[in-house]
Every structure is written in C-alpha cells, then in structure tokens.
Curated annotation (Swiss-Prot):
UniProt-annotated binding residues for Fe cation: C102, H145, H149
Gene behind this protein: def
Organism: Thermus thermophilus
Family: Belongs to the polypeptide deformylase family.
Protein name: Peptide deformylase
Keyword Transmembrane recorded: no
Cofactor or coenzyme needed: Fe(2+)
GO MF term set: metal ion binding; peptide deformylase activity
Catalyzed chemical reaction(s): N-terminal N-formyl-L-methionyl-[peptide] + H2O = N-terminal L-methionyl-[peptide] + formate
Pfam family, one: Pep_deformylase
Length: 192
C-alpha cells in the first residue's frame, strides 16, 4: 500500500512521536512504508510522514547504478534495508555540512545542513530485537534526518539561524503551497 506523504504544515510532522510498543504489525507497516518511499524516490521515510505518530522509520542503502545501463527501478538497486524502531543516538563524532531534502518538502534542499559525521544508534528491528549500528557519512546523515522526524524536527531547522531565515524566505511560496496541500489532505482524510 502506498500512503500519501504528509507535507510541511501537517501537525503530525511537528510532534514528538510515541514509542513503538506493539511490534505485531510493524513488518507489514515497514513494507508499506518502503513501497511509499520507493514511489517517491526517497532514501528514508519516517512514520510521521505517513501520518503515524510512532518512533519508526525505514531507510535504504542503494548500490551505484552501473554506467551505461538503462535506468533501473530503485527497488532493484537496494543494497541494504533498515527498519528502525525507537532509535537512540548514543554517540556522535565530528561535524560536517551536507545536502538534504525531504519527501515532506518536495523539491526543497539545503547544501549546508550540519550533522555528526559518525554516530552509534541503538534501536529495535521490526521484530522488537535490540540492535546497535555504527554509521558514518551519508547513512549517518540519513539516520539523523529520520530520527529528527520522530522528534518533530525538519532539516532546515538544523541550519544556523541566518541560513534558516534565508531558506524560509527563499522558499516562502513553496512552503505556503505545502501548507495548503497539507490542510486539504487532512480535510480529505477526515471526510473519508
């Protein structure tokens, strides 16, 4: 099942998500979240982005597409899938700026989002088993971005204040449009 992705302006994106306690439906939910993420051409998707206040996200590592081949569906390029519930970052090292976008802010990016270069994350998998991962570089950035979603934080809020204000000003029209679309979707969902 492909879920509609909640856009900037939807209140669920601004709330701290509740811990996952019942894992009985998480595997199926994660499959649907992955399908939704692939449809949107993303690398990660947090439960609040589909309207669920749960501390859960999915993320994938993609293999590089071989040169000269026809473009393949993203699903065929997956190297590793992560299903992450109740994550806690227990260690951070280094600080690097990098480019980020978000499926809840489609088409908007910032090249200067500061994140830890290396992290250690403790979490539970789709069956509730405890796991520990050490990540660096791009996947460390993806995990930090998705964990922020679980805390009601959007990527541009990580920018230093002057850059954040410049981002908001430069993208004002798009942000207003997202807010209108978010309200329309909420209205549609409440009537359906």
């Amino acid at each position: 099942m492909v879920y509609p992705i909640r856009l900037y302006g939807d209140p669920v994106l601004r709330r701290k998500a509740r811990p996952v306690e019942d894992f009985s439906g998480i595997k199926r939910l994660a499959e649907d979240m992955l399908e939704t993420m692939f449809e949107a051409k993303g690398v990660g998707l947090a439960a609040p982005q589909i309207g669920l206040s749960q501390r859960l996200f999915v993320a994938v590592e993609y293999a590089d597409e071989p040169e000269g081949e026809e473009e393949r569906p993203l699903r065929e390029l997956v190297r590793r899938v992560y299903v992450v519930a109740n994550p806690v970052i227990t260690y951070r090292e280094g600080l690097v700026e990098g480019t980020e976008g978000c499926l809840s802010l489609p088409g908007l990016y910032s090249e200067e989002v500061p994140r830890a270069e290396r992290i250690r994350v403790e979490y539970q998998d789709e069956e509730g088993r405890g796991r520990v991962l050490e990540l660096e570089g791009y996947m460390a950035r993806v995990f930090q971005h998705e964990i922020d979603h679980l805390d009601g934080i959007l990527f541009f809020e990580r920018l230093p204040k002057p850059k954040r204000e410049a981002f908001l000003e430069a993208n004002r029209a798009e942000l207003v449009r997202f807010q209108k679309e978010a309200r329309a979707l909420l209205k549609e969902l409440s009537q359906g």
